[in-house]
């Protein structure tokens, strides 16, 4: 009889930069003209005129996508995608790989803690923990495949048979016609646009309310671009529009500000969390009781392992969790939890008026909502149920082709006479790397 301790160990870690546009975990790595980057959308950079027209002008898509593969000793491979591009791949191998090789992939809590604590001196939030998130998701995908179970069955099983979606996009009428539960629209103007901008925001939302009728849920995404005074005034001006919730009105770090806007409008729903990280960050949001919903992104906050802790914390305060985007990675979480009433679908078509896979053409079998919902049967495949599209394989640039650098600890003492012509030039190594990425990326889009 096989011992319960006989379980495949982690044998190898591989990472890939995803070349081109329109594939992988960076939602904003799309072609020009896409509503998500080139619509009128208020952002933290909208206060400067040169950064208003397109979100790419201030670099929202600068990192790009990457993919991590984790291979077990029995040959099983789990994988996941996220945002981070070349810097993410570098950290996967130069820092985080040491905690993974030879480890038991079932020890997701231990592996998260080791990676999180070891990167605390430069991480905790942002890109480092987003990289940990993708590694964690690849571990869960591996576990599901080894056990021949969908991930949601590994984390408690189904609490519902159907996942209802709302759609984030430019046209609520399109979301309604496609069968979605509700629609979320990005706010077009910021406080620096003055009273005229505020008036235009109200007119914009009134137009959409009239287009879908009085009862179809409309949510507003403010994308961290407002301040307390402006938010209070805008919400007051829109009280008759029956806005379901106001999302990310303030900087993620302005927890006191959320208390002030909730005090000003106690019966209005406010949400945030898309740009928060780890259970420690969400503890502040939950314990303040100034938010009606939290919206973690499983590809950013620390992965599924950390999201489960955040969900338990929120449940103790009776606060619903509505995950931000993340495609199937969120779907398995959402269907397993009792305090997750619905899920976001981020419209991935250029005009936002049709339903396409969240991760573009990277996978052949990504489940997408039909008539605004999915069922548990749509998720009943091992792991996260995804298969890398053979036609997209050429976009996966192995990171070991780009990063052939010795470990820092093994570098010999400097010897100027042995420096190559390339590396002795200013930024020679970085320039060479950039040229390789550019040439490979260009070749995938031609």
Locate each region found by the language model.
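Shared catalytic-loop signature of beta/alpha-barrel
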Residues: 46-48, 242, 253-375, 379-383
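Conserved, mostly hydrophobic/aromatic
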Residues: 10, 75, 96, 135, ...
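Short beta-strand elements
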Residues: 66-72, 367-369
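Metal-dependent enolase-superfamily TIM-barrel catalytic cores that perform enediolate-based chemistry
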Residues: 156-261, 265
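Metal- or metallocofactor-binding catalytic centers and their adjacent structured scaffolds
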Residues: 38, 54-56, 71-146, 414-418
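Short loop/turn motifs at secondary-structure junctions and domain boundaries
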Residues: 58-62
């Amino acid at each position: 009889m096989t011992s319960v301790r006989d379980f495949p160990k982690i044998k190898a870690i591989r990472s890939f930069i995803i070349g081109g546009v329109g594939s992988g975990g960076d939602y904003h790595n799309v072609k020009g003209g896409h509503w998500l980057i080139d619509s009128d959308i208020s952002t933290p950079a909208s206060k400067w005129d040169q950064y208003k027209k397109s979100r790419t002008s201030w670099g929202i898509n600068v990192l790009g996508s990457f993919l991590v593969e984790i291979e077990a000793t029995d040959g099983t491979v789990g994988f996941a995608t996220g945002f981070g591009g070349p810097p993410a791949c570098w950290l996967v191998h130069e820092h985080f790989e040491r905690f993974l090789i030879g480890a038991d992939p079932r020890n997701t809590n231990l592996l998260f803690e080791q990676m999180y604590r070891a990167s605390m001196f430069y991480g905790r939030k942002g890109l480092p923990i987003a990289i940990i998130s993708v590694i964690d998701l690849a571990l869960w995908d591996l576990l599901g495949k080894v056990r021949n179970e969908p991930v949601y069955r590994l984390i408690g099983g189904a609490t519902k048979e159907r996942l209802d979606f709302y759609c984030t996009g430019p046209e609520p009428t399109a979301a309604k016609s496609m069968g979605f539960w509700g629609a979320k629209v990005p706010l077009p103007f910021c406080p620096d646009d003055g009273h005229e901008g505020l008036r235009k925001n109200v007119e914009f939302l009134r137009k959409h309310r009239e287009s879908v009728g009085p009862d179809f849920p409309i949510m507003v995404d403010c994308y961290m671009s407002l301040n307390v005074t402006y938010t209070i005034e805008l919400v007051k001006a829109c009280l008759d529009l029956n806005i379901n919730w106001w999302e990310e009105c303030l900087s993620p770090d302005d927890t006191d500000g959320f208390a002030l806007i909730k005090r000003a409008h106690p019966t209005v729903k406010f949400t945030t969390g898309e740009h928060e990280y780890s259970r420690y960050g969400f503890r502040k949001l939950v314990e303040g009781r100034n938010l009606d919903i939290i919206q973690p992104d499983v590809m950013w906050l620390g992965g599924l392992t950390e999201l489960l802790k955040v969900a338990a914390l929120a449940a103790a305060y009776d606060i619903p969790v509505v995950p931000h985007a993340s495609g199937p990675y969120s779907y398995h979480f959402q269907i397993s939890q009792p305090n997750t009433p619905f899920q976001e679908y981020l419209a991935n078509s250029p005009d936002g008026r049709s339903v396409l896979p969240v991760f573009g053409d990277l996978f052949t079998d990504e489940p997408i909502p039909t008539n605004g919902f999915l069922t548990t049967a749509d998720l009943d495949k091992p792991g996260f149920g995804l298969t890398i599209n053979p036609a997209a394989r050429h976009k996966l640039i192995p990171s070991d082709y780009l990063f052939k650098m010795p470990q820092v600890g093994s570098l010999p003492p400097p010897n100027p006479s042995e420096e190559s012509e390339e590396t002795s030039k200013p930024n020679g190594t970085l320039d060479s790397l950039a040229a390789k990425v550019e040439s490979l990326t260009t070749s995938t889009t031609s």
